[in-house]
Amino acid sequence: MGLCFQLNLASLSLILFSSFPGLLAQSQQHFLGQNNTSLLSGGRCNLARGKWVYDSSYPLYSAFSCPFIDSEFNCQKAGRPDTNYQHFRWQPFSCPLPRFDGANFMRRMRGKKIMMVGDSLSLNMFESLACLLHASLPNAKYSLRRSQPLTSLTFQDYGVTINLYRTQFLVDVVQEKAGRVLVLDSIKQADAWLGMDVLIFNSWHWWTHTSGLQPWDYMREGNQLYKDMNRLVAYYKGLNTWARWINNNIVPSRTQVFFQGVSPVHYDGREWNEPLKSCNGQTQPFMGQRYPGGLPLGWVVVNKVLSRIRKPVHLLDLTTLSEYRKDAHPSLYNGISKDLDCSHWCLPGLPDTWNLLLYSSLTS
């Protein structure tokens, strides 16, 4: 996402914020107190507040031994010369974050189906979880079936299937006479998400793409066709369609639902007080007390929607801990192009911590 569009999006966001006065402060206070906590040792632990510490026992697996990493995330194979980014561990201030135990994960999830639903950030998290499990249980038999939009990884000895359903917006994109239409109030593809024991959703980055990078020509809500609209408003409408689907279709005793949270980008060094820089060449996390760039605008929308949803949805609030990791992107070592990638994440790397948050929630 380019800087020009980020600035344009910021100005357009005023329309959304004028509709929800005090939204950012209220959401931050509410969710830092509730959704980011996990029950550990009989108390409540806030996993979202902490710092990155160097740990020589990391990474938890090797980029060269995990068979699931796509070239776009395999930064070492693509020639990245430094490895420090692999050795940082997230340490919450109030408690330790449990270390990943693949055998325990499999015992808890035996016979269950997990599905991650979203874009390439969901792919990032899916491949990380696959690598963590493979490293913990290297002799476990597995089968992998890749297709579009569904990829399935089954660990046969445990009856555990981890699915990835690729969708950029959660709501539908359909071909109509006018062209490709992003339908803000339609979610027919969600039939494929039924029957899961665990669902982890994600969507944000594609809502900000413009011009040739956006995979639609028009937006539609009801019978009204739009050439474009405020992207935060569109995102809010789309997420509300998803929330209605959750309310109407999820039985909490059968299915646990998570929202992956908003993954930040690091194209603009002004966000961490290094003007004119990007993620390229970064070798250390941001170590300050508070990230200068603040929270992404999408984070505000996510929290607004989750605050009103009737069914339980646990927010994996990975945003702040990920904002500190300006060093953890593929940058120029993405294996597929010469374009700078400050959006996705190297593996092993930051998404392993996302999965530690998930692991903590599933096993605590």
Curated annotation (Swiss-Prot):
User: Mainly localized where?
Assistant: membrane
The terms describing its cellular component in GO are: membrane
Q: Which InterPro entries match?
A: TBL (IPR029962), TBL_C (IPR026057), TBL_N (IPR025846)
Task: List residues traversing the bilayer.
Answer: 9-25
Q: Has keyword Transport?
A: no
Where is this chain's protein located in or outside the cell?
A: Membrane
UniProt keywords (A-Z) are: Membrane, Signal-anchor, Transmembrane, Transmembrane helix
Which topology term describes how it sits in the membrane? Single-pass type II membrane protein
DCXHWCLPGXXDXWN motif, short sequence motif: residues: 341-355
Residue ranges of the motif GDS motif? 118-120
Molecular function in Gene Ontology: O-acetyltransferase activity
Note from the entry: Contains 2 motifs that are conserved in esterases, but it is unlikely that this protein belongs to the catalytically active pectin esterases.
- Function noted in UniProt: May act as a bridging protein that binds pectin and other cell wall polysaccharides. Probably involved in maintaining esterification of pectins. May be involved in the specific O-acetylation of cell wall polymers.
Report the sequence similarity comment from the record.
Belongs to the PC-esterase family. TBL subfamily.
Q: What is this protein called?
A: Protein trichome birefringence-like 40
Origin organism is Arabidopsis thaliana
